[in-house]
């Protein structure tokens, strides 16, 4: 009987559930909700898939079935509704590729509980009415492009989640934020542009568990009221400008599990309160100004898993109680002032996997106890004064799980051990650079089949490069530069599997600390945050290698950098090198190479740095988009080369003797050819005459063909001028040729990204710059004309104006206004004589002008224009040093040689944003990234990248960011312009530059924000 009752109950429950489901599916929108959704839809730039939009009849009324919408009946919500309509309670439209504005009509959805629009491209401001929805529980607008001030009048009594992470809100965080949020659990305002201090009223959010304020411009100290948030489990304050001491009241946050205060300006001692924080598993305080010893409570924390105190001024001995710290997995204490020996008890921290002790002066050896360090996977002792490399390697080989080992700048002038019994079976990354080590490449490395990255550069290693390196199938980065290796390049290196195809690509190890490479007393270091940041590279430069360059190098399609500079290589440059389709840098300079430069190299569409200087090459220099951008220095020291970067090429006259002999041998062939040609010509003329007579007799003339012919004839002789009010003031191609001496090399004033630029003085005395776009532009004449006319309409005081265009042979000529002071690149990097370089006021004015020009292209010009190649050489200066952007929009006029390279990917190494490596679509935020690099050039006076340099900072961005985290900003700035009077202004510009360089495009500012920020910087007199 009991069983029967259960069955009856189950049947009834199932029946009721079915009724509820049926009723839910049949619900239709309340008329007010329907209008609100219509208003929301009209604010978007495109329709939503799954929404039944009908222009003629408005919406389909059955909106409760639409994608992303959940409804409840008005009765179930306790509403008095005789029609029992469906009320919208959830709007879940995250990751729907939405763009446009968030309509204020959404605020009319008065029963809405969840509004989730995360990861779209919505923009504009947030209406204050949206923050007065009394039933709203979740508001997630994260990862969009919303901007403006955040509304200060907030009345959301039911709200549990407020997430506006990764937008562009600015101004103060509203002081009243927490006044009417009694149920709030999560507040995430990170990755915006909020400034000022953390409001005192934050303490009123008594129920909050997650508080994210990271990556803003917040300053001042942490308000004491924040430490009243006893429910707080996550506090994220990193990447701001917060300062002052860290209060001991921190211990009141007893539920805190994650605390990140890194990259701020906190100072003083770290409070000794960690025994009270017995749930804290993540603590990062790196890149602050903390001093004193590590708190004992921190060294005895049973809960800590990740501990990062890198880049402070902490002192004393490193002490960790591994008996207590049973959960510790990652330890980063690098760049501090600790003293004493390496803690020998660390292997007793049984879960510890990654250790970074870089830049700590131990002056000691690696403890014998490390043989028992079985949990260790990543270890860095870079620049830590470690001694006895033989002992170190013998001990560390016993760490069976070790995958990453960095020992740079230690063991000075010791000998790299060659004991064949050494084994590192799981090692993936080995960096022992800048140690002046003696010896050879040790055979024991062949016992590391998983090796992906090997850097033994800047040592004194000798002998030959072993062929077995080519059998390391995972190796994608090999740097043996600046040693004394001899012999041929092993042929086996041309078959490295990880460089042949993407199918053989390997997953990079990801330790929790940065790598520092090639750092010694002569130059700053180059930082890589992950092994995957290293470009696929073979660098054998600055050795004594001989023999030829293997043609099979062309099989390495994934290789980005091939540097064979400063060796004794001979023979020809193989044409097969054009197969390295991903190559960005090719340096073969300072060798004994002969023959010509293979024309096939023009197919290397990504090639940004190229040098064959100081060899024995001859013949014409290839022409093409990439080769026209390389400086003359790339080809100097080769007397036999000719072309646009060297002396003009001429047809060599044969000697009289040789000519006479050839003439006697071929006289019969010449007579035969002449007779045959004559007869053929007579025949063709006869046929042509008959066709003309036949056509004329019929009176047939194709007007369209005649118009095309006339247009081509006109285009080849005349110059189309824009904005020319004087119709009598015409310009002909003859005028252009005369003004440039038929494009004589002496008139070249620049090598732009799309062709050579010539200076010309027109018959009326006007100076102009003429850009010669060589080769096929990939467009018909009419398409080209339409594009050029569009560009000519871009008129702004900070743009180089396009004055006209014409055809010349197979080339297109663009005529621009002339800028007397040349490029910013010249003034920052090339000017060596005359008056001093640009002062700070001028540099700031140039930055402002360039920003205004870019903002015009992005926001005011119709149609909007992406520049795609912002760099210092594309910022030209007038006689009064007013900045003018050049080369905007030219990417649409040029098609590269390879079809796999789109016009969107045009750019210059050092300026290309990181996301362009994964996508083929250029964006406005990509231009902003490149502008950030230019700001760094203005601040530092340094080029963004010079991969071919054997020393120095190759990557300006990495160097600046590292110096910034170490609070060494004053060392970043160009000494010519840096002084205390301008320090604050320069720091502000540096902050703007770093904003532009954010890895996530959505976190970068708009160009209008750039203009506003730069204009608000007051220049000291």
UniProtKB/Swiss-Prot annotation:
Q: Which residues form the active site?
A: 869
Q: Which keywords appear in this protein's UniProt record, sorted alphabetically?
A: ATP-binding, Cell membrane, Glycoprotein, Kinase, Leucine-rich repeat, Membrane, Nucleotide-binding, Receptor, Repeat, Serine/threonine-protein kinase, Signal, Transferase, Transmembrane, Transmembrane helix
> Where does the secretion signal sit in this chain?
1-24
Q: Where are the LRR repeats?
A: 21-43, 85-109, 110-133, 135-156, 158-180, 181-205, 206-229, 231-252, 253-277, 301-325, 326-349, 351-372, 373-397, 402-426, 428-448, 449-474, 476-496, 498-555, 556-580, 581-604, 606-629
Xref: InterPro entries: Kinase-like_dom_sf, Leu-rich_rpt, Leu-rich_rpt_typical-subtyp, LRR_dom_sf, LRR_R13L4/SHOC2-like, Plant_RL_S/T_kinase, Prot_kinase_dom, Protein_kinase_ATP_BS
Q: Which Gene3D superfamilies match?
A: Phosphorylase Kinase, domain 1, Ribonuclease Inhibitor, Transferase(Phosphotransferase) domain 1
**What processes does the entry annotate via GO biological process terms?**
defense response; response to other organism
Q: What is the tissue localization of expression for this protein?
A: Expressed ubiquitously in leaf, apical meristem, hypocotyl and root.
Q: Where in the cell is it found?
A: Cell membrane
Report the superkingdom from the record: Eukaryota
Top EC class, one word:
transferase
Pfam families assigned to the protein according to its UniProt record, in alphabetical order: LRR_1 (PF00560), LRR_14 (PF23598), LRR_8 (PF13855), Pkinase (PF00069)
Q: Where is the Protein kinase domain?
A: 743-1014
Enumerate the glycosylated residues. 26, 54, 83, 116, 132, 204, 217, 231, 311, 321, 327, 383, 388, 482, 546, 568, 576, 592, 632
How the protein sits in the membrane?
Single-pass type I membrane protein
The UniProt transmembrane annotation reads: 673-693
The residues listed in the UniProt record as binding ATP, with positions renumbered to this chain, are 749-757, 771
Q: Which reaction does it catalyse?
A: L-seryl-[protein] + ATP = O-phospho-L-seryl-[protein] + ADP + H(+); L-threonyl-[protein] + ATP = O-phospho-L-threonyl-[protein] + ADP + H(+)
What post-translational modification does the entry describe?
Answer: N-glycosylated.
Additional free-text comment from the UniProt record:
The 36 amino-acid island present in the 18th leucine-rich repeat contains a ligand binding pocket that directly interacts with PSK. An island domain has also been found among the extracellular LRRs of the brassinosteroid receptor BRI1 and has been shown to be critical for its function.
Q: Which family does it belong to?
A: Belongs to the protein kinase superfamily. Ser/Thr protein kinase family.
Q: What does this protein do?
A: Phytosulfokine receptor with a serine/threonine-protein kinase activity. Regulates, in response to phytosulfokine binding, a signaling cascade involved in plant cell differentiation, organogenesis and somatic embryogenesis.
Q: What is the protein's given name?
A: Phytosulfokine receptor 1
Question: In the record, what lineage is assigned to the organism producing the protein?
Answer: Eukaryota, Viridiplantae, Streptophyta, Embryophyta, Tracheophyta
């Amino acid at each position: 009987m009991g069983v029967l009752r259960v069955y009856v109950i189950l049947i009834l429950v199932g029946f009721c559930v079915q009724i509820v489901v049926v009723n839910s599916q049949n619900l239709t929108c309340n008329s007010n909700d329907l209008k609100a959704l219509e208003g929301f839809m009209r604010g978007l730039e495109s329709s939503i898939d799954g929404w039944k939009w009908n222009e003629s009849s408005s919406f389909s009324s059955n909106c409760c079935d639409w994608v992303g919408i959940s409804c409840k009946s008005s009765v179930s919500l306790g509403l008095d509704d005789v029609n029992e309509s469906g009320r919208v309670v959830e709007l879940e439209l995250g990751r729907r590729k939405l763009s446009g504005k968030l309509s204020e009509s959404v605020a009319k959805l008065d029963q809405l509980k969840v509004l989730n629009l995360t990861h779209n491209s919505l923009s504009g401001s947030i209406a204050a009415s949206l923050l007065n929805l009394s039933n709203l529980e979740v508001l997630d607008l994260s990862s969009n492009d919303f901007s403006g001030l955040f509304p200060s009048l907030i009345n959301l009594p039911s709200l549990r989640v407020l997430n506006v992470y990764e937008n562009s809100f600015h101004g103060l965080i509203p002081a009243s934020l927490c006044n009417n949020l009694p149920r709030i659990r999560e507040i995430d305002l990170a990755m915006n542009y909020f400034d000022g201090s953390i409001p005192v009223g934050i303490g009123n959010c008594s129920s909050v568990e997650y508080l994210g304020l990271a990556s803003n411009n917040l300053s001042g100290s942490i308000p004491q009221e924040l430490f009243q948030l006893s429910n707080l489990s996550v506090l994220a304050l990193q990447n701001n400008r917060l300062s002052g001491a860290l209060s001991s009241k921190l211990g009141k946050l007893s539920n805190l599990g994650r605390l990140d205060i890194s990259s701020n300006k906190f100072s003083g001692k770290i409070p000794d309160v960690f025994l009270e924080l017995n749930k804290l598993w993540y603590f990062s305080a790196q890149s602050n100004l903390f001093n004193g010893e590590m708190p004992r409570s921190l060294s005895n924390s049973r809960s800590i898993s990740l501990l990062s105190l890198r880049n402070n001024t902490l002192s004393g001995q490193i002490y960790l109680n591994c008996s207590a710290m049973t959960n510790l997995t990652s330890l980063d204490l690098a760049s501090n002032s600790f003293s004493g020996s390496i803690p020998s008890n660390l292997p007793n921290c049984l879960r510890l996997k990654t250790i970074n002790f870089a830049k700590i002066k131990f002056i000691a050896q690696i403890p014998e106890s490390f043989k028992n360090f079985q949990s260790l996977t990543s270890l860095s002792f870079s620049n830590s004064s470690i001694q006895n490399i033989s002992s170190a390697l013998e001990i560390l080989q016993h760490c069976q799980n070790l995958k990453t080992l960095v020992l740079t700048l230690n063991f000075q002038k010791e000998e790299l051990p060659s004991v064949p019994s050494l084994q590192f079976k799981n090692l993936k990354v080995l960096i022992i650079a800048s140690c002046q080590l003696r010896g050879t490449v040790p055979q024991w490395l062949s016992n590391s089949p998983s090796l992906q990255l090997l850097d033994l550069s800047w040592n004194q290693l000798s002998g030959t490069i072993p062929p077995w390196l080519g059998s390391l199938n995972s190796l994608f980065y090999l740097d043996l530069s600046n040693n004394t290796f001899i012999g041929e390049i092993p042929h086996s290196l041309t078959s490295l599997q990880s460089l042949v195809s993407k199918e053989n690509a390997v997953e990079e190890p990801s330790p929790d600390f940065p790598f520092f490479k090639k750092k010694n007393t002569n130059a700053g270091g180059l930082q890589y945050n992950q092994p995957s940041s290293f470009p696929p590279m073979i660098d054998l430069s600055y050795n004594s290698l001989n023999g030829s360059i293997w043609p099979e190098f062309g099989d390495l399609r994934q290789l980005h950098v091939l540097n064979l500079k400063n060796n004794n290589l001979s023979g020809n440059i193989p044409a097969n090198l054009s197969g390295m389709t991903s190559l960005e840098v090719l340096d073969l300079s300072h060798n004994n190479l002969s023959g010509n430069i293979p024309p096939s190299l023009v197919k290397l569409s990504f090639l940004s740095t190229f040098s064959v200087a100081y060899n024995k090459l001859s013949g014409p220099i290839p022409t093409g988009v990439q080769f026209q951008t390389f400086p003359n220095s790339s080809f100097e020291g080769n007397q036999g080369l000719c072309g646009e970067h060297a002396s003009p090429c001429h047809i060599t006259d044969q000697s009289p003797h040789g000519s006479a002999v050839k003439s006697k041998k071929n006289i019969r062939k010449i007579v035969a050819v002449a007779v045959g040609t004559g007869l053929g010509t007579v025949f063709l003329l006869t046929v042509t005459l008959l066709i003309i007579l036949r056509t004329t007799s019929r009176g047939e003339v194709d007007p369209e063909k005649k118009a095309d012919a006339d247009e081509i004839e006109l285009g080849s002789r005349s110059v189309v001028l824009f904005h020319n009010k004087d119709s009598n003031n015409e310009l002909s191609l003859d005028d252009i040729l005369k003004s440039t001496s038929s494009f004589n090399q002496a008139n070249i004033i620049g090598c732009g990204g799309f062709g050579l630029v010539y200076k010309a003085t027109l018959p009326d005395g006007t100076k102009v710059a003429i850009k010669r776009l060589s080769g096929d532009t990939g467009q018909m004449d009419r398409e080209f004309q339409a594009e050029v006319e569009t560009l000519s309409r871009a008129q702004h005081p900070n743009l180089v104006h396009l004055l006209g265009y014409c055809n010349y042979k197979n080339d297109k000529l663009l005529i621009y206004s002339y800028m007397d002071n040349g490029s910013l690149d010249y003034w920052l990097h090339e000017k060596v004589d005359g008056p001093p370089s640009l002062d700070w006021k001028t540099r700031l004015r140039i930055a402002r002008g360039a920003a205004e020009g870019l903002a015009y292209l992005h926001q005011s010009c119709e149609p909007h224009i992406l520049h795609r190649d912002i760099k210092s050489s594309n910022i030209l200066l007038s006689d009064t040093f007013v900045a003018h952007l050049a080369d905007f929009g030219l990417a649409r006029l040029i098609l590269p040689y390879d079809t796999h390279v789109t016009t969107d990917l045009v750019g210059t190494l050092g300026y290309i944003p990181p996301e362009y490596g994964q996508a083929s679509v250029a964006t406005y935020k990509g231009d902003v990234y490149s502008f950030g690099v230019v700001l760094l050039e203005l601040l530092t006076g340094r080029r963004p990248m010079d991969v071919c340099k054997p020393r120095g900072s190759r990557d300006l961005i990495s160097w600046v960011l590292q110096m910034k985290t170490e609070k060494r900003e004053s060392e970043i700035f160009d000494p010519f312009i840096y002084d205390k009077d301008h320090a604050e202004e320069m720091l502000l510009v540096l902050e703007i530059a770093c904003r532009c360089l954010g890895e996530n495009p959505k976190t970068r500012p708009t160009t209008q924000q750039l203009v506003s920020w730069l204009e608000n910087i007051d220049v000291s007199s």
